[in-house]
Amino acid sequence: MPAIVIVGAQWGDEGKGKATDLLGGRVDYVVKPNGGNNAGHTVVVNGEKYELKLLPAGILSPNAIPIIGNGCVVNLEALFDEIDALKARGADTSKLRVSANAHLVAPYHQVLDKVTERFLGKRAIGTTGRGIGPAYMDKVARLGIRVQDVFDESILRQKVEGSLAQKNELLVKVYNRRAIDVEEIVAYFLGFAERLQPLVIDSTIELNNALDDGKVVLMEGGQATYLDVDHGTYPFVTSSNPTAGGSSVGSGIGPTRITRVVGIIKAYTTRVGAGPFPTELFDEMGEYLQKTGGEFGVNTGRPRRCGWYDAVLARHAARINGFTDYFVTKLDVLTGIEKIPVCVAYDVDGVRHEEMPMTQTEFHHAKPIFEYLDGWTEDISGAKTLDDLPENARNYVLELEKMSGTRFSAIGVGPDRDQTIVVHDLIDG
């Protein structure tokens, strides 16, 4: 049966949570294959808004088993805070499972993240300060602590000692901070062991057995294509691979088992933090999109930078990920705009580029070349089919589809899961 991947096609905050929630009632497993509690997503169910960070959006789907995959980095304190907050609102979190091979975010990762950003000053990346980058650094440097280590005190202590031997030198001699005590960290992790134990599984075996048994598995990528450490706007990226290929690595599901890759893309573009953004708006229209679209980060509350739809980025994202479908969100936010610019190419130092520029310098110099599409004033929030849309809104969707090189299978016309036009079924279509 199908393994489906959902990937953000821009710089995050595209509405992946809504897409996962929409499909959640039809899938058996929802897996988060990468990232940590640095990437928030919002899900609206029956008019109630849920802001999730570490947990997969599938946690709100009554039939799906949500799994935090081996490619994630897990802050245990944040995990249980989020679980408790959902329980307090009546949500069932009992089916949640966590991969034994997922890495852990330690308190010292958060300390290092914050002091490093302060040290960098104007050169800072704009991280969330939640220790995600340092945790991934330890993973790659083979200094990481995994979920399974919490249940073996001697291994846990050995790993904490190895990691802090280096970090304390840095904290004390470079950043003028106090050294972190090994036993303090060991006690911190051991304090979660009893509550964590029932959640831990071999997720690779579980998920592949599920596929063998005819179950449907949905992989919900965190962050987005242009935050990918390899394919994003480096160095203004995250520390993992939130592109489609990273979903295989972060879940243990082989690439040949993936049957569908769905790109989630806004009808305009947003970005949080530093980095190049060719279509960014610095005027009242940017403020309008920000206010109308509710463009403020789930995790940090930071206002998102807003700009027009970028078809160059959309085509490139489709190529990198092998998208079979696009799910377009927030079309309703554009209602009332008379003429809507769409970026179809870049001007880089006088040369037209219809593809993503090769170098970082070229992309920083890229200026958008726009085509202008007619807007609409009618309320589209109740539309159920493409034919329900006013002519100009329908034309906008069809033109973007043509420019982006991948079929548009679903269009969001409001925040609720039911405010979605489904053109092609995202599981069987």
UniProtKB/Swiss-Prot annotation:
Keyword Ligase: yes
Keywords: Cytoplasm, GTP-binding, Ligase, Magnesium, Metal-binding, Nucleotide-binding, Purine biosynthesis
Name of the protein this chain belongs to: Adenylosuccinate synthetase
Protein's cellular compartments: Cytoplasm
Pathway(s) per entry: Purine metabolism; AMP biosynthesis via de novo pathway; AMP from IMP: step 1/2
Reaction catalyzed: IMP + L-aspartate + GTP = N(6)-(1,2-dicarboxyethyl)-AMP + GDP + phosphate + 2 H(+)
Binding, IMP: 13-16, 38-41, 128, 142, 223, 238, 302
Role: Plays an important role in the de novo pathway of purine nucleotide biosynthesis. Catalyzes the first committed step in the biosynthesis of AMP from IMP.
Main location class: cytoplasm
GO annotation, cellular component aspect: cytoplasm
Keyword DNA damage listed: no
PANTHER family according to UniProt: ADENYLOSUCCINATE SYNTHETASE
